[in-house]
UniProtKB/Swiss-Prot annotation:
Belongs to the class I-like SAM-binding methyltransferase superfamily. RNA methyltransferase RlmE family. It is an enzyme of class 2 (transferase). Signal peptide: none annotated. This is Ribosomal RNA large subunit methyltransferase E. The lineage of its organism: Bacteria, Pseudomonadati, Pseudomonadota, Gammaproteobacteria, Legionellales. Keywords: Cytoplasm, Methyltransferase, rRNA processing, S-adenosyl-L-methionine, Transferase. It comes from Coxiella burnetii (strain CbuK_Q154) (Coxiella burnetii (strain Q154)). The active site is at 162 (proton acceptor). Its EC number is 2.1.1.166. GO terms for cellular component: cytoplasm. It holds the Pfam family FtsJ.
Length: 212
């Protein structure tokens, strides 16, 4: 059996995939975020949130449900996402100055401080099947997400990002720790056990220019 056929069979049998279809989420990834929230209380009503690499939209949908009508969720991705009531969507690469400026302008317009309480990212690279290549690309996306977060995250805010385990992750964590009071690795049960994906949860942002 080829890798693709094996993946399709597992995908069709996956209980989270079946649950997502039943409950109206665009992907099983929603349950990873819900599980993390249930344990760490990421979201509060009226929060302002940026979802980087938001397609197909599951995390944005969860975020909007949890921050409520007074909260703001800004989703950004190169790919389109399903239309969601009250989620602001930007299609483009947030690493491009023009798109980042658009993101920054929306944050300034929609928040009192020009900053957000939470930056989340479930981004993954296009998978090549070559483990070290995919892991390196994943780490690069994490670094881009952090570069964006440090510019728009309010003091006391939270940064949640997915990464594939491998070289450079521990070094990234060492570099990240001075900017937050709490940094930890997470592996939600909704993540497939054979997947190398983990999540970095960094809480109580100290401010980019105020690190200890």
């Amino acid at each position: 059996m080829t890798h693709s056929k094996r993946w399709l069979e597992e995908h069709e049998k996956d209980p989270y995939v079946k649950r997502a279809k039943k409950e109206g989420y665009p992907s099983r990834a929603a349950y990873k975020l819900l599980e993390i929230h249930q344990k760490y209380k990421l979201f509060k009503p009226s929060m302002n949130v940026i979802d980087l690499g938001a397609a197909p939209g599951g995390w944005s949908q969860v975020a909007k449900d949890l921050v409520g009508p007074k909260g703001v969720v800004i989703a950004i991705d190169l790919l389109p996402i399903q239309s969601m009531l009250d989620v602001i969507f930007i299609q483009g690469d947030f690493n491009e100055p023009e798109i980042f400026n658009q993101l920054e302008a929306i944050v300034a317009k929609k928040t009192l401080t020009g900053q957000v309480d939470l930056v989340i990212s479930d981004m993954a690279p296009n998978i090549s099947g070559i483990k070290n290549v995919d892991q390196s690309r994943s780490l690069h996306l994490v670094e881009l997400a952090w570069d964006c977060a440090q510019k728009l995250l309010a003091r006391g805010g939270t940064f949640l990002v997915k990464v594939f385990q491998g070289p450079g992750v521990d070094r990234f964590l060492i570099n990240l720790r001075p900017y937050f009071n709490q940094v930890k690795f997470l592996k939600p049960s909704a993540s497939r056990s054979r997947s190398s994906e983990i999540y970095i949860l960094a809480g109580e942002f100290l401010g980019y220019n105020q690190r200890v």
